[in-house]
Design a protein with these regions (language model features):
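A cross-family signal for key residues in well-ordered alpha-helices
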Residues: 19, 51, 79
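Short amphipathic alpha-helical interaction segments
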Residues: 38-56
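Short alpha-helical segments that sit at the start of domains
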Residues: 1-29
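Short, amphipathic alpha-helical interaction segments positioned at domain boundaries
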Residues: 73-92
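Short acidic, hydrophobic short linear motifs in intrinsically disordered regions
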Residues: 23-44
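A short, conserved structural fragment
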Residues: 54-65
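Minor-groove-contacting beta-hairpin "wing" of winged helix-turn-helix DNA-binding domains
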Residues: 66-71
Length: 92
């Protein structure tokens, strides 16, 4: 067995974060809360994985909303994973 492989749980975690990042959009509201991240994504992923990403402060989930916020740390980690997977960002 290859020891460099990650567990299915870790893969789900990392790939969900990447998918949230790649499908992000800017909130059109002009009334951002102080320090609120500008990027949002739709919450159509595994709930347990989203809860874990929220616990790790990679996303902010305002319960009752259909979308969530990507934190600066979440954006940076997603970019790092994109680099590892050799996936080009939209901005490149």
């Amino acid at each position: 067995m290859n020891d460099n492989k990650v567990s299915p749980d870790q893969a789900l975690h990392d790939l969900t974060l990447v998918m949230l990042y790649l499908t992000r959009f800017k909130d059109r509201k002009k009334t951002f809360l102080q320090g609120e991240p500008p990027f949002r994504a739709w919450k159509s992923y595994d709930w347990d994985t989203l809860d874990k990403l929220c616990e790790e402060e990679l996303i902010i989930d305002r319960h009752g909303n259909k979308s969530l916020y990507l934190t600066d740390e979440g954006v940076e980690k997603a970019k790092h994973i994109l680099d590892i997977l050799r996936i080009r960002d939209w901005e490149e």
